[in-house]
Amino acid sequence: MNDKVTAVRDVWRYEQGEISKVEDRMVTEFPLTVILNGSEFVTLVCTPEHIEELVIGFLASEGVIRFQKEIKRFTIDESLGFVYVDLVHPETLDQKDYTKRVIGSCCGKGRHFYFQQDVKTAKTAVSQIKISPEACLALMKDMQQGSGTFQDTGGVHNAALCDTEKLLLMRTDIGRHNALDKLYGHCLLNGMSVRDKLIVFSGRISSEVLLKAAKIGVSIVISKSAPTELAIQMAEELNITAIGFVRNGSFNVYTHPERIRE
């Protein structure tokens, strides 16, 4: 499916006072419907690569599974845009938990979430890793330079799993949430520990993005964009260091600055 990630079309470009017809490369969108235990569960609009990682990461993020071994069958039908997933224990899945928006509290401390499953799956960060300011800047630069699809199209989000010195894994998608789910799915498929890892991200740190990072289990999120106020509240409560506006040699630390090495 990798050859379907981008497409070339004719466009009319205005430049230096003139309009000319040129070829331009753009990213594709792919609707992917997940059939879970024989019933339609969700349709994800995504960049069509690393599909297995995306679906497994999404299911884990939603609290449907915790481990890859909970999946009995996983089949991709590329021609129709369907993924069929059967769980080992389908009787444990309550469909109501994944279709109704509710507010729950975590550990009796009044934490507010969008879905009841967030209460079960968001993890309070426990890692005491520290990162230098220089590494924050370098990791962001490496991620931006490492995305060929972004360089070609300007139409995708990037997310990278890193240690405090280098990028370990990068995923790209038109949806910022999808890019994070692909990281999560890769970790589950490969038994990769995230305890002392961090995420570098191209999009803004919204509350949904912060929650996905918490579910993955990282303790530091670095973004070139701004966080929202609700995301900062959640980061404070979940013991996550939120770093934003990483650009031009500077950045802001919004929560838990003790993880920044002086």
Swiss-Prot record:
Record Pfam families: FdhD-NarQ
Compartmental location: Cytoplasm
Signal peptide: none
GO CC term (a single one): cytoplasm
An example Gene Ontology biological process: Mo-molybdopterin cofactor biosynthetic process
Function field: Required for formate dehydrogenase (FDH) activity. Acts as a sulfur carrier protein that transfers sulfur from IscS to the molybdenum cofactor prior to its insertion into FDH.
The family this protein is said to belong to: Belongs to the FdhD family.
Name this protein carries in UniProt: Sulfur carrier protein FdhD
Gene name as annotated: fdhD
